Amino acid sequence: MCIRDRSNSALKAEKKALRTAADGLIVIAQTSEYSALAEINSETDFAAKDSKFLEFCNEVKNHLEKNKVESAEALNNDFNEKREALVQAIGENIQIRRLDLVENDGSVGTYLHSDSKLGALVSINIDNVDLAKDLAMHAAASNPSCITQDDIDKDVLEREKAIYKKQAEESGKDKNIMEKMVEGKVRRFLEEVSFVSQPFVKNPDQKIQELLDESGASIVTMSRFKVGDGIEVEKKDFASEVAEQLQ
């Protein structure tokens, strides 16, 4: 790419960088040493289906299979020029938003949904790839927040407790009954968000912990990316969207 074209690409990419990119695709790369999960964002689903965007995502995947890149920042640096050129070609903000890399100690299972907008990695401490794959599929489907109940973020737990306490107080019941109401709701909440406490998606009569116990396995790490998770999207009318695309 010549200096002038490079300058134009960089300028356009800089202008569009502040625009919300909450669509896109998930890519998964696996080697004998590690597995990687990355989210690559575009502004619209239309752009996410563009052949140039798909080619870019495939290049990122191939790069991750050949290079042990351990942060989204480093991955962005590796692809900055190509990303800027893609922004110029497609006319949308394109970002490599996040990356998670897991060492292949024990077994690592991966799951990528058919639309490539949801992916998961789960590593376990034993050599059982089929189990790891089942767990990755479960993580994608059930969206656990933590591996065990002890791993739940304390601020999240306290916020939930406060909500349940307020609900109990509004019930007007006796104090001891209200305490039991809160305890019951907290217990159910922890069971719902904890990986090992959830019913296994392939066999709802069995908890994940029971599945692990059958093989003497434990979950080491869990990572789940859904395209656009946590990104606040501003509602715009059609005319505004068209005008913005022309900038």
Locations of the language-model features?
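N-terminal assembly/interaction segments in proteins that build large macromolecular machines
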Residues: R4-Q247
